[in-house]
Amino acid sequence: MHLTRLNIERVRNLKTVALHGLQPFNVFYGANGSGKTSILEAIHLLATGRSFRTHIPKNYIQYEADDAIVFAQSATEKIGMQKLASGEQLMKVNGDTVATQGQLAKLLPLQHIDPQSTEIIDHGAKPRRQLLDWLMFHVEPEFYFAWQYYSRALKQRNTLLKTRRNLSLADLEPWNKMLSNYGEILHSQRLSIVEQWNVYFQNDLSQLLPDLEIELEYSPGFHTEQGLMQDLLNQHQKDIERRYTEYGPHRADLRLKTLFGHADDVLSRGQKKLLIIALKLSQIAMLHASNKETVVLLDDLTAELDLTAQQRLIERLSQLGSQVFMTTLDRASVKKHLHDLSISYQLFSVESGQVSLAAP
């Protein structure tokens, strides 16, 4: 879904934003603190139901306002989100209220590329697992169903472990069965997708880091040779002592291995940034191969990447048919890249929360 229209109300310092005629590349420039990143934040809120800067709605809803609203339109769809300061939200697709955020996310596959962040590599398994599951959600039709049932069983089992001290295997049996059943399904799905993803990843890695050999290695979170049920049975007493479930797909990881060790241990900060970009580009490529359009948020392109990396990234996103919303302090460099690559774009000036169309 590519956006032709975007409306934003009461997000941070932004005045009422009404953008029309959006292009494949949409560039927002202005001083620090002008509100550039808040535009990306609003699009992220629409697609995911949350900000990438804070978990607290009051922090991005304007002072003394009760809500924030983001609306977008494509050639075929209209989607909208009202986020209340309480955290509640109202979502609509083509005028009809929808019950889950997943319905918006399916329509608006969204990748956020922040060249300044190395969180996916440096901050443990969770962000890597989330990266993998973003791809799963968009390319594996049965994943969301299996994950919902697995998560429900995990929550119930953990509640028992936390609230009851004299648990028997019989008490845990119904949740063990459900966890084992859906956990094995999730493992099989993830394993298959990682194998496919690795092909796309190697292609983008060779363009950004041609001198490095890195493999995606999926760690399932349990001992696959004996199965998840056996792990749950063997560990039930320790789980009672820990008061949570140790083994299962919720503990999975996506390891990035080089010839010299794990990426987080051996790569420089600059290499880590390019590696993360390669991971996300390869996911976009996999969706593109399935005829799915991705919207990409690219924050502060020129801050951390050299000119060659900037141009390679812009060119690759254009090849993949992505619609890009990017921020920059250096509009001259970005304009040159876009002109050199003959890419259609729209330029917007952002000043004290006011967004206006600028001359290309």
Curated annotation (Swiss-Prot):
Keywords: ATP-binding, Cytoplasm, DNA damage, DNA repair, DNA replication, DNA-binding, Nucleotide-binding, SOS response. ATP binds at residues 30-37. Transmembrane segments: none annotated. It is found in: Cytoplasm. One of its GO terms (cellular component) is cytoplasm. GO terms for biological process: DNA replication; DNA synthesis involved in DNA repair; double-strand break repair; SOS response. Disulfide bonds: none annotated. InterPro entries: DNA-binding_RecF, P-loop_NTPase, RecF/RecN/SMC_N, RecF_2. One of its GO terms (molecular function) is single-stranded DNA binding. It holds the Pfam family SMC_N. The keyword Transcription does not apply. NCBIfam families: recf (TIGR00611). The RecF protein is involved in DNA metabolism; it is required for DNA replication and normal SOS inducibility. RecF binds preferentially to single-stranded, linear DNA. It also seems to bind ATP. HAMAP family: RecF. Belongs to the RecF family. This is DNA replication and repair protein RecF.
